[in-house]
Amino acid sequence: TSSCAEYTPYIQTVTTIFMALFGVNFTVYFLLLQRKFRQALHSSELWTYVGIILTATLAISVNIYRSMPSFGQAVHHAAFTVSSIITTTGYGTLDFNLWPEFSRVILCFLMIVGACAGGGFKVSRIVILCKYAKNELERLIHPRTVKVVKVDGKQVSKETVHGVLVYTLFYILIAMASMLLVSLDNFDASTTISSV
């Protein structure tokens, strides 16, 4: 039941790196195999994913460092847990239920992202939604502006954007309905939200 907690910090660090690497969109690896390094490294999805991991790791590290022997250990455990949660791998070095509420909420958001091929909302959809939202905000300021959603310099079709919006709507509705069903068992809000 101790998951990866029994392993040395070195093995945990290697596991962290590989969990994070395998959460990257497989298209990036395909581009690297084709020696299209510039195109692979300019992937907005890749940098959004890296940004999410780094931001979450830093925020959680700062939040939990008082309960750790050193800031380095806080970063170590935060990075491992963030990589595990965002990739839906499920490994652990510590019981993050003992962490402050702020850190657990961040982990709940990361569970939704689900960067790997196995499940979750996906970083690519987040990128498309953010670019669409930016275009809509610009349209509020300049109503005659005609904007298209572009990802990595390529136009995303209206059908794809529409599909992402519909998927997002249903994702939220199903999550809310599931939370309501789980709440019938009188769990606290944190348990209800994280169990969905």
Each predicted region: which residue ranges?
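Membrane-proximal intracellular helices of multi-pass ion channels
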Residues: 1-196
